[in-house]
Amino acid sequence: MGKITIVNIDDCVACGACSGTCPQSVLEVNDHVEIKNPDDCIGCGACVDACPQGVLKVE
């Protein structure tokens, strides 16, 4: 499995759907999404599926 990356940061609307779905608490959302614990990412893609804006990608 890969790791999460941010591909369209300007499209982030800070809804929090991604961080609320992540089982590893890798993401934090304030004004926009940030990857706070990248080494903890298990590459499950839950955050990618939850994001309505397509901001995230697992590579």
Curated annotation (Swiss-Prot):
[4Fe-4S] cluster 1 binds at residues 12, 15, 18, 22. InterPro entries: 4Fe4S_Fe-S-bd, 4Fe4S_Fe_S_CS, Fe-S_Ferredoxin. GO terms for molecular function: 4 iron, 4 sulfur cluster binding; metal ion binding. Gene3D superfamilies: 3.30.70.20. Ferredoxins are iron-sulfur proteins that transfer electrons in a wide variety of metabolic reactions. [4Fe-4S] cluster 2 binds at residues 41, 44, 47, 51. Binds 2 [4Fe-4S] clusters. Keywords: 4Fe-4S, Electron transport, Iron, Iron-sulfur, Metal-binding, Repeat, Transport. Residues 2-30, 31-59 form the 4Fe-4S ferredoxin-type domain. This is Ferredoxin. Pfam families: Fer4_10. Its cofactor is [4Fe-4S] cluster.
